[in-house]
Amino acid sequence: MGDRGGAGGTRRRRTGSRPSSHGGGGPAAAEEEVRDAAAGPDMGAAGDAPAPAPSKDADDGVASGHWELRCHRLQDSLFSSDSGFNNYRGILNWCVVMLILSNARLFLENLIKYGILVDPIQVVSLFLKDPYSWPAPCLVIAANVFAVAAFQVEKRLAVGALTEQAGLLLHVANLATILCFPAAVVLLVESITPVGSLLALMVHTILFLKLFSYRDVNLWCRRARAKAASAGKRASSAAAPHTVSYPDNLTYRDLYYFLFAPTLCYELNFPRSPRIRKRFLLRRILEMLFFTQLQVGLIQQWMVPTIQNSMKPFKDMDYSRIIERLLKLAVPNHLIWLIFFYWLFHSCLNAVAELMQFGDREFYRDWWNSESVTYFWQNWNIPVHKWCIRHFYKPMLRRGSSRWMARIGVFLASAFFHEYLVSVPLRMFRLWAFTGMMAQIPLAWFVGRFFQGNYGNAAVWLTLIIGQPIAVLMYVHDYYVLNYEAPVAGA
């Protein structure tokens, strides 16, 4: 390259001294000739040498207006992978514009076809069937009983009033009741609604996970204290003056801080932020209010009509229409899911963390870059992932289980809670959620085996976009048949 560049520069100087046979050259040719003449020495062996000023011969060449004899060089097209070009910002903007226009058309089509269906007052009926009966809020308040019971057991274990075996038995009974009691109320009390049931069961599920962690951490502290006592050591309190040590953590203040903190894993000393940022908190609260209204509006205006129109194809088993309705439902469902993710994991959890000065704000990672199903499940819900690793996966490994069996165990637990939170509020057990979660195991193997890089990322997005509407249609269809067609047939 250096020899060729130098030769080109020499040839231009030689031709520049000849009289022109073509008359005056255009300004573009003259500018190209000056640029190449100046760039010639930079392409030599001393590539870092500064470009010299144009020589007198080059100036003469510009004045005489010679055409450049060479205008091509070795290079790849921009879309070729070898070109090294990666600035596709304009194409990304084009995709965003096309997405906005496409959804605007769908929005106008929906308004023309159905009119305005958004009714904020109707949302109240989703939580309360009878204005004089509030079973869901009562269940949430009753959850305090289980938290106090776990606290009292730990207090007695700390002073030796209970043996570890008796404490374990009481904790198991308490944790089992946390899951069974609200489920029994939901199945037996007619005045509770599916949405109210879902919220109550979610509160009890979160309480179950938190108290499970609370019990484990206090047990580890007792074992560490007993080990230190048997070795003749005494815990040093001067090392960290502002930290809490066991059993000083066993207070109601500490317990309820943990219960309201945006985490499922208990610690004696949580990282704390120095102050409450009022502007940050205000932005998060405004986001919570805005996205709540947006989700309700999209569900009422977009999803509900699509689901209602999907019942007849399911009843007639018209597979082509079922696929068409599935794809039509995929867009609003996925959009609402993305909004829900931002609303919950960024707006809500950050607002709670800011109020409580909770320092660990890693509620999610870059799951949108997932190139495998496993990476997605490890990064989209960090509080649950940390709990599974700390209190389920690693304990199974310590007990001698293989990594493969531990992973299956984690997915089994996740599948159980997914089915618990769907089937019990709907009062029907179809195991679609359980099957969908367990199907993630072979799906993770398949995607990891046959798809890599961008293809793996596309496969993950495809499962998210298509998989969820399938489960939604399955449950809605069965719920519709069970609650609307069956009573009519019986009548």
Swiss-Prot record:
Q: Which domain of life is it from?
A: Eukaryota
Residue segments, region Intracellular loop 1 (IL1): 227-279
What transmembrane ranges does the database entry give?
87-121, 134-159, 165-187, 195-226, 277-311, 319-356, 403-423, 432-450, 453-484
UniProt binding sites for an acyl-CoA: W377, Q378, N379, W380, N381, I382, P383, V384, H385, Y393, R407, Y480
According to the UniProt topology, which residue ranges lie Lumenal? Answer: 122-133, 188-194, 312-318, 424-431, 485-491
The protein's annotated catalytic reaction(s) are:
an acyl-CoA + a 1,2-diacyl-sn-glycerol = a triacyl-sn-glycerol + CoA; all-trans-retinol + an acyl-CoA = an all-trans-retinyl ester + CoA; 2-(9Z-octadecenoyl)-glycerol + (9Z)-octadecenoyl-CoA = 1,2-di-(9Z-octadecenoyl)-sn-glycerol + CoA; 1,2-di-(9Z-octadecenoyl)-sn-glycerol + (9Z)-octadecenoyl-CoA = 1,2,3-tri-(9Z-octadecenoyl)-glycerol + CoA
Is Endoplasmic reticulum one of the keywords? yes
User: Where are the stretches annotated Extracellular loop 1 (EL1)?
Assistant: 122-133
For this protein, the record's InterPro entries field holds: Diacylglycerol_acylTrfase1 (IPR027251), MBOAT_fam (IPR004299), Oat_ACAT_DAG_ARE (IPR014371)
Q: What PANTHER family would the database entry show?
A: DIACYLGLYCEROL O-ACYLTRANSFERASE 1, STEROL O-ACYLTRANSFERASE
Subunit structure comment from the entry:
Homodimer or homotetramer; both forms have similar enzymatic activities.
- Indicate what this protein is called per its UniProt record: Diacylglycerol O-acyltransferase 1
